[in-house]
């Protein structure tokens, strides 16, 4: 189809559907495309791109698989469980199975150390955290309204919060001077800027633990956020989908703990949760909205009709999540494995002088490559990113995709691969840095087809910059979608 025909066809479609609201043209998704075209495999494609742009927890699958084998009756797809097939297959109310909501509420409590309890009647289902975030926006805001979001923040918030709802994002700028902590001054500045631009701010959304920082918010910060939204009479949405990934001190403090001892309006407090990160089950599409506002619960249930959790999943998970022995073991083992993997990765980077922001949670590191930039700008960051993806081989995500205010930061995921693949990725990165130091400001011609043995460089002359810009056109064009698009497979 020619470009003129494609343009004409767009006029036949809705503005929402044909807008750029999905964000697929960002470097965040370009890295996915590079991986999708040339995925790493230890024997079939050892020179391929290693996926380090996917925040997925694959370190505890064995625990879940072992439970499934020991509990065949939990699934309707086994001889032991097939007798429940009809009850699961027929029409289900959008409120969700009572046992499912009870199990989710119990797990949410245990994932937060049992310090708070959750009412199953306030659990609203959705298709993953993506659907849950959008559902909250539909409940709380009108098209054109805005939410404050501290940066750096999850790149797909642009899609999740605003593509179909028409809600705007107003970044709250945070920087490395205080390890990207959220300050009252930054909140006030963002709020006042929105007011001057006649933007109606309906709320503040935070991720705790943070994606991409891998840090947790302390009680004092959370209390200041609650005070801020109460003063402004706006909503606070807390995305807590990484609650059970905390692997070292300080411990996780959830918003529910904080408001127990505060004089605040609970109608303004809402939580988004999911089993995608804590349990590594993004394919099951379990998203949850937990609101202290009765109207949001009631309206959210109606809206959840457009993205329910499958009945089969609702049937299986209660048996697992209400198994106290399994849950206790899982919540003890999973963080230990994350801590070990985090330690291996960060120490491996430190061998060549690369540091990450100190973190205690999540499935990723916030890697500091500022000293490797020839040009301390976001253009310089993109030059370095293209070299890393195209020449070195891991798909990492540039900080600019997360609206970071400082160039040179990258999110690197470490929990979505086996130990051997992680070692290959580390070897490639370390070799790149070491050979770049030797090359200094010289542009060294790549001699070996093996990426981690190539003479790669860290400094880029204008000619080499143009060369990689050209490569980005040829290799990372947003219009070159492969049949198995990562945009289809992307996890929340």
Swiss-Prot record:
SUPFAM superfamilies on file: PLP-dependent transferases
One biological process term in Gene Ontology: fruit ripening
Keywords recorded for this protein, A-Z: Ethylene biosynthesis, Fruit ripening, Lyase, Pyridoxal phosphate, S-adenosyl-L-methionine
Its EC number(s): 4.4.1.14
Transmembrane segments: none
InterPro entries in alphabetical order: Aminotransferase_I/II_large (IPR004839), Ethylene_sulfur-biosynth (IPR050478), NHTrfase_class1_PyrdxlP-BS (IPR004838), PyrdxlP-dep_Trfase (IPR015424), PyrdxlP-dep_Trfase_major (IPR015421), PyrdxlP-dep_Trfase_small (IPR015422)
Major enzyme class: lyase
GO molecular function list: 1-aminocyclopropane-1-carboxylate synthase activity; pyridoxal phosphate binding; transaminase activity
A Pfam match: Aminotran_1_2
Names of required cofactors: pyridoxal 5'-phosphate
Pathway: Alkene biosynthesis; ethylene biosynthesis via S-adenosyl-L-methionine; ethylene from S-adenosyl-L-methionine: step 1/2
Reactions mediated catalytically: S-adenosyl-L-methionine = 1-aminocyclopropane-1-carboxylate + S-methyl-5'-thioadenosine + H(+)
Modified residues (N6-(pyridoxal phosphate)lysine): 277
Matches recorded under CDD domains: AAT_like
Role played: Catalyzes the formation of 1-aminocyclopropane-1-carboxylate, a direct precursor of ethylene in higher plants.
Quaternary structure and partners: Homodimer.
Entry's family note: Belongs to the class-I pyridoxal-phosphate-dependent aminotransferase family.
The protein's name in its UniProt record: 1-aminocyclopropane-1-carboxylate synthase 1
């Amino acid at each position: 189809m020619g470009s003129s025909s494609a343009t004409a066809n767009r006029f036949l479609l809705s503005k929402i559907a044909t807008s750029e609201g999905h964000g697929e043209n960002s470097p965040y998704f370009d890295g996915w495309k590079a991986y999708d075209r040339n995925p790493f495999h230890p024997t079939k494609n050892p020179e391929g791109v290693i996926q380090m742009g996917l925040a997925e927890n694959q370190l505890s699958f064995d625990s879940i698989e072992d439970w499934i084998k020991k509990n065949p009756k939990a699934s309707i797809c086994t001889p032991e469980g097939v007798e429940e097939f009809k009850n699961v297959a027929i029409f289900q109310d959008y409120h969700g199975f009572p046992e499912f909501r009870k199990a989710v509420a119990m797990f949410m409590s245990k994932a937060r150390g049992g310090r708070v309890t959750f009412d199953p009647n306030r659990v609203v289902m959705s298709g993953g955290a993506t659907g849950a975030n959008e559902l909250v926006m539909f409940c709380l805001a009108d098209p054109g309204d805005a939410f404050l979001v501290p940066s750096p923040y999850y790149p797909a918030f642009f899609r999740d919060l605003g593509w179909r709802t028409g809600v705007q994002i107003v970044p709250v700028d945070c920087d490395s001077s205080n390890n990207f902590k959220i300050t009252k001054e930054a909140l006030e500045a963002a709020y006042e800027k929105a007011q001057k631009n006649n933007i109606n701010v309906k709320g503040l959304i935070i991720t705790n633990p943070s994606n991409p920082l891998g840090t947790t918010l302390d009680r004092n910060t959370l209390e200041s956020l609650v005070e801020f939204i109460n003063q402004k009479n706006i909503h606070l949405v807390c995305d807590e989908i990484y609650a059970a990934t905390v692997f070292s001190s300080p411990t996780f403090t959830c918003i529910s703990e904080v408001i127990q001892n505060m004089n605040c309006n609970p109608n303004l407090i809402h939580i988004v949760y999911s089993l995608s990160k804590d349990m590594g089950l993004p394919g099951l599409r379990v998203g949850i909205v937990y609101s202290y506002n009765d109207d949001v619960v009631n309206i959210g249930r109606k809206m959840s009709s457009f993205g329910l959790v499958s009945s089969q999943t609702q049937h299986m998970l209660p048996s697992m999540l209400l198994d106290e022995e399994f849950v206790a073991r899982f919540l003890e083992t999973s963080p230990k494995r994350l801590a070990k993997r985090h330690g291996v990765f960060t120490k491996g980077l430190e061998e060549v002088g690369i540091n990450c922001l100190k973190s205690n949670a999540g499935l990723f590191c916030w890697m500091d490559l500022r000293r490797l930039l020839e040009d301390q700008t976001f253009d310089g960051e993109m030059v370095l990113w293209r070299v890393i993806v195209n020449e070195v081989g891991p798909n990492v995500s540039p900080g600019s995709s997360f609206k970071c205010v400082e160039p040179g930061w990258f999110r690197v995921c470490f929990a979505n691969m086996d130990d051997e693949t992680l070692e290959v990725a580390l070897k490639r990165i370390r070799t790149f840095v070491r050979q770049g130091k030797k090359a200094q400001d010289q542009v060294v011609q790549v001699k070996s087809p093996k990426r981690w043995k190539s003479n790669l460089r860290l400094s880029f002359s204008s000619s080499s910059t143009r060369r990689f810009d050209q490569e980005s056109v040829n290799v990372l064009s947003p219009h070159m979608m492969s049949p198995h698009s990562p945009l289809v497979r992307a996890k929340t």
